[in-house]
Swiss-Prot record:
Superkingdom, taxonomy of origin: Bacteria
Name this protein carries in UniProt: Peptide chain release factor 1
Main location: cytoplasm
Entry's transmembrane regions: none
Gene Ontology cellular-component annotations: cytoplasm
Gene3D superfamilies hit by this protein: 3.30.160.20, 3.30.70.1660, 6.10.140.1950
Entry annotated with the keyword Protein biosynthesis: yes
Organism the protein comes from: Listeria welshimeri serovar 6b (strain ATCC 35897 / DSM 20650 / CCUG 15529 / CIP 8149 / NCTC 11857 / SLCC 5334 / V8)
Entries under Pfam families matching the protein: PCRF (PF03462), RF-1 (PF00472)
Post-translational modification: Methylated by PrmC. Methylation increases the termination efficiency of RF1.
Homology family: Belongs to the prokaryotic/mitochondrial release factor family.
Length: 358
């Protein structure tokens, strides 16, 4: 572990020199990339330096204890030695976590896709509830939410809604929401008071930059059509809606939220790029992790990850067996308790895997 930490510190010092190099300063992209790399290892380097400093103090205190001391000084030195040993152990645990490989997508913005699944109108209403929940969570963290496309139902729900979330740590926290979300409640239209079960699926995609995934014009078929509203009626007579098909993968994205065809195409391209990037990344990750299943779950969008039980005011995350009797607060966007628990479980699993590999 310590060889790796020393290598990280050496790289940090090298980056310091590079960031003051005139050739780097005059190249905005390289400057941005190197600054981002340095920022990503700063916490590790600072903790490692603190750890080395504590080690030096331990050595000095050990030498002091080997000298001739009066009883009071010896007792003080022993207490200091015990405190330093405790601090060293805590720093070692922090360093182990800091060495866990970071998801390269963690700093990216998010494309959020929610679809009503099993349950008809009630599933569409639940999809709308989930979108409002995520919107409030985003607001609490200072993220910006922009609806990119939506297919609303006439009763206040969504068959599908796609939105962009821009903000610090957006993907690192939202990525755990991937999967099928189940709701158990009495629908407003249910006269007999029976509890119905419905589901909505959530997909969390990292926004892909053009430099990360190159889409060639020859691989994209563009179709235009008139925008339609709820119920299928045409809402304008111009061909402003856009459908993009990525021929090699068969991925299709339609966008009709804007009145401008150009704006719809731009939004559709962002979603298409994210979906193609996600497909390639998932395939690579599945191949790499073929023999390892994460404790947090596979992240498969068909996997039921969470149940929202309204009569019992209960939310259960099935991946980690966490049950919280605060559904009313969760639906108001207070998601940190669940997400923090998922992050901790994920880090613990990765740390165990790292220890096994070593």
């Amino acid at each position: 572990m310590y060889d790796r930490l020393q290598a990280v510190e050496d790289r940090y010092d090298e980056l310091n020199e590079l960031l003051s190099d005139p050739d780097v300063v005059s190249d905005p992209k390289r400057l941005r990339d190197l600054s981002k790399e340095q920022s990503g290892i700063t916490a590790t380097v600072e903790t490692y330096r603190e750890y080395k400093n504590v080690n030096e103090q331990i050595d000095e205190t050990r030498e002091l204890l080997g000298e001739k001391l009066d009883d009071e000084m010896r007792e003080m030195a022993k207490e200091e030695f015990a405190e330093l040993q405790k601090e060293k152990a805590e720093l070692e645990e922090r360093l182990k976590l800091l060495l866990v490989p970071k998801d390269p997508n963690d700093d990216k913005n998010v494309i959020l896709e929610i679809r009503g699944a099993a349950g008809g109108d009630e599933a569409a209403l639940f999809a709308g509830d989930l979108f409002r929940m995520y919107s409030k969570y985003a607001e609490s963290r200072g993220w910006k939410v922009e609806i990119m496309d939506a297919n609303p139902t006439g009763i206040g729900g969504y068959k599908e809604i796609i939105a962009m979330m821009n903000g610090n740590d957006a993907f690192s926290r939202m990525k755990y929401e991937n999967g099928a979300h189940r709701v158990q409640r009495v629908p407003e239209t249910e006269s007999g008071g029976r509890i119905h079960t419905s589901t909505a699926t959530v997909a969390i995609l990292p926004e892909a930059e053009e430099v990360e995934i190159e889409l060639h014009d020859k691989d994209i078929r563009t179709d235009t059509f008139a925008s339609t509203g709820a119920g299928g009626q045409s809402v304008n007579t111009t061909m402003s809606a856009v459908r993009l098909t990525h021929i090699p993968t068969g991925i299709v994205v339609s966008m009709q939220d804007e009145r401008s065809q150009l704006k719809n195409k731009d939004k559709a391209m962002k979603v298409l790029r994210a979906r193609v990037y996600d497909k390639f990344e998932r395939e690579a990750r599945e191949e790499y992790d073929a023999n390892r299943k994460s404790a947090v779950g596979t992240g498969d969008r068909s996997e039921r990850i969470r149940t929202y039980n309204y009569p019992q005011n209960r939310v259960t995350d099935h991946r980690i067996g966490l049950t919280i009797q605060k559904l009313d607060q969760i639906m108001e966007g207070k998601l940190d308790e669940i997400i923090d628990a998922l992050i901790l479980e994920d880090q613990t699993s990765k740390l165990e895997h790292l220890n096994d590999a070593n």
